[in-house]
Regions:
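N-terminal pre-catalytic "stem/leader" segment of glycosyltransferase-like enzymes
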Residues: 1-39
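Generic detector of well-ordered secondary structure
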Residues: 21, 25, 61, 71-72, ...
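Secretory-pathway luminal glycosyltransferase catalytic domains
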Residues: 39-161
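Conserved small/polar residues in nucleotide/adenosyl-binding loops
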Residues: 162-169
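N-terminal cationic-hydrophobic initiation segments that often serve targeting/anchoring roles
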Residues: 27-28, 127-128, 164
Length: 170
């Protein structure tokens, strides 16, 4: 079994989604079982939200993987070696921000990331007011740019906005 005990300490929900998808993708590639940790405010210093936001019905185990060898992602991009020769009985760590870790199980990941009804229903109710019209939602990151000095890198404040023709205009 491979695990990712540090989910919830290395980034917020978006990072956690990549991390879970990667550990599941690596496990499925090699035929291993995998685990993600339970919600534990004593050890998770960040905002661990996977189990609160999503159904996560396809998770093999929700538990810690104690007494296993650590396996660290070596780069901030796809680590092909880790993907291809990851041994069993390891506890992976990293950000895993590439779909290459899980593209072979995309349908499973999409099912895992079905929103729980307490998040989904208010959103659907909100959308009803638009009567089926196309709607665009925009998320603006506001917190991370303020952490520049702590993280050691600069943010690019460039926003590219373009419009594409509506299918109705064709």
């Amino acid at each position: 079994m491979i695990g990712f005990d540090s989910i919830g300490t290395m980034g917020r929900l978006g990072n956690q989604m990549f991390q879970h998808a990667a550990v599941k993708g690596i496990a499925r590639k090699h035929g291993y079982e995998y685990a993600i940790p339970p919600k534990d405010p004593n050890t998770q210093i960040d905002n661990y939200g996977l189990l609160d936001a999503f159904e996560m019905k396809g998770v093999d185990h929700i538990k810690y993987c104690y007494n296993v060898v650590p396996a660290q992602e070596r780069f901030f991009h796809y680590d092909e070696e880790l993907m291809n020769i990851c041994p069993d009985n390891v506890n992976v760590a990293g950000f895993f921000q590439s779909e290459k870790y899980f593209e072979h199980i995309e349908d499973e990941i999409r099912k895992d990331y079905t929103f729980k009804n307490n998040w989904l229903q208010p959103s659907l109710d909100f959308m009803d007011q638009f009567g089926g019209e196309e709607v665009l939602f925009l998320h603006v990151r506001r917190g991370d740019p303020n952490l520049t000095d702590k993280r050691g890198f600069k943010w690019a404040y460039v926003c590219l906005l373009y419009t594409s023709p509506s299918p109705r205009d064709s």
